[in-house]
Amino acid sequence: MKYLLVEPKVKSIAPNIALMKWATWCERNNHEFEYVKGNIRPSIQPDVILMSCIFSFYSRKYGETIRHYRNLFPKAKIIVGGAFPSNMPEWFEQFPYVEIHHGLSEEIESLPPKYSIDKKNKKIITYASRGCVNKCGYCTVPKLEGDMKSFQSIKETLEYGLKEIPDATGVVLYDNNFTAHEYFDNIVDELRDFGLPVDIHGLHVSDFTEHHAQRFAELKWGAQHENGTAYNRFSFDFVGYEKHVKRALELSEKYKIKAGFFCYLLFNWKDSPHDFWKRIILSQRMVDEVGRTVFLFPQRFEPLNSLERNNYIGDKWNDDLVRGVVKLYTFMHGFIPLTTTRNIFRWIGYSYEEFLDNVIKFSTVRGYRLNKKSGEPPSTDSLY
């Protein structure tokens, strides 16, 4: 059998781990395979086409890719998997020749990814767990992956990854909630002993304890970015998380974890602009009290069934406010850095009224970004 592994050409910050695992499956079962990205003409004549579809708002691109390969190989079996078809199988009914794979395959999940199919990737990217203990209303994980399943060891995957990428620069875990991992200590031991810089996604502030901080201090951080920048990624999605966020920040400083403190700020969901602004202010207060920089990354909410990106406006928001917030953090190169100097607030606003005023003005301007040489934002005079 010949398998064509298709990754649609959409914006992505990481290689497609699912297709890498399928490549390993093909190799171990003596099936010929080819991995492609985008709508091209592959070198093989496939019997089966496996396609990964993650985000619903790329539906148009996915449709184009399905039609492209159907036209090239009308006799091939087409199977699509991922979050989008698992959440919205009805959308794929327009393609009666397409078979949908729902959720995760235990057989495939147990395999290490074949990293070498992506020649540009230099990181060992994997999971130490799937699923999550939480059931957040804005997240697809509970439906796609189910209850949390912790893997007792990732040593085999790490060693396999190093064989695939001898010059690997780091290890990245894309877990949803690593702080709730059943075998947390064992995984940290393996990461520490492996020796490469690490980056771990999915750290929940409500689960973060002194023990987590102590163990994280043992790790070498900085796998995600080529310049060695490292972050511990938390989220501050609701004002009620304040005490948890502050506790995590205090522990990070106490144990001198060598990674920046990074917080996602969900907005445009059930929150209001005032709620969003208040989380920024509360974060700054924590910075002042603890003395550790916090990097805020606003995350615009997208409904799980959205077929187009950036069209949804929350009940308590409007288009100008959402667009202004997006431009505000885009102009700061993607995040809002909070330091004890408070310099950033002359750009954001020192009161809620100033914040609203600046956000509305940001929604109408173009071309401003943080000055890379000086590290200072442009004068707010240029926005008036």
Annotated model-derived regions:
Residues C26, C132, C136, L173, ...:
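Conserved, mostly hydrophobic/aromatic
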Residues P46-L50, V98, G137, T169, ...:
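Conserved acidic residues
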Residues I17-A18, K119-Y160:
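Canonical Radical SAM [4Fe-4S] cluster-binding loop centered on the CxxxCxxC motif
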Residues W221-Y384:
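A structural motif corresponding to the C-terminal lobe/cap of the Radical SAM core domain
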Residues K2-K123:
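Glycine-rich beta-alpha loop elements in corrinoid/cobalamin-binding modules
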Residues N71-K77, L196, I257-A259, R292:
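A short helix->loop->beta-strand "cap" motif at the edges of active sites that frequently abuts
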Residues W22, K61-Y69, T157, N186-I187, ...:
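A general structural detector for well-ordered alpha-helical segments in enzyme core domains, enriched
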Residues L5, I154-W269:
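Conserved SAM/AdoMet-binding glycine-rich loop
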